[in-house]
C-alpha cells in the first residue's frame, strides 16, 4: 500500500474508535493532534495511539505496554498478540476505566 492509502485506512480506524467512544457513553476524553490520538480517563491515565508511516503500522501504548498493529487481510492485527486493533482498544479502555464499556 502507498502512504496515501495507509493514512486513509488509519483515519478510518481512528474515526471508528471516536464513534464507538461517543456512542458508548463512556467517560473517555480523546484528542487527535497530528499523527497521535490520546485517550484520557478519569484517573488521568492515558492510551496513546500513534501512526507510524515509515513502517505502515499503528502503535498503541497503555498500562499494559506497547503494541504494534499491521494491516493484514483487511484488519489491523497486533504483531505480538494477534488481536484486532479495535478489540484491543476496547480491552485497554476497560482496563483504564475500571469498568465494562458497551461498544459495538
Curated annotation (Swiss-Prot):
Protein name per Swiss-Prot or TrEMBL: Iron-sulfur cluster assembly protein CyaY
UniProt cross-references to SMART domains, sorted A to Z: Frataxin_Cyay (SM01219)
The keyword Iron is assigned to this record: yes
Species per Swiss-Prot/TrEMBL record: Vibrio vulnificus (strain YJ016)
Entry superkingdom: Bacteria
Keywords for this protein: Iron, Metal-binding
A GO cellular component entry from the record: cytosol
UniProt record, GO biological process: iron-sulfur cluster assembly
Keyword Metal-binding listed: yes
Family per similarity comment: Belongs to the frataxin family.
Any one Gene Ontology molecular-function term assigned to this protein's record: ferrous iron binding
Protein purpose: Involved in iron-sulfur (Fe-S) cluster assembly. May act as a regulator of Fe-S biogenesis.
Amino acid at each position: 500500500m502507498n502512504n496515501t492509502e495507509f493514512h486513509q485506512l488509519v483515519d478510518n480506524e481512528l474515526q471508528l474508535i471516536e464513534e464507538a467512544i461517543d456512542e458508548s457513553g463512556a467517560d473517555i476524553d480523546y484528542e487527535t493532534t497530528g499523527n497521535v490520538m490520546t485517550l484520557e480517563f478519569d484517573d488521568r491515565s492515558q492510551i496513546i495511539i500513534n501512526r507510524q508511516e515509515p513502517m505502515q503500522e499503528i502503535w498503541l501504548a497503555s498500562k499494559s505496554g506497547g503494541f504494534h498493529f499491521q494491516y493484514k487481510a483487511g484488519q489491523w492485527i497486533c504483531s505480538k498478540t494477534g488481536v484486532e486493533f479495535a478489540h484491543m482498544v476496547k480491552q485497554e479502555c476497560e482496563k483504564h476505566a475500571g469498568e465494562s464499556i458497551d461498544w459495538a
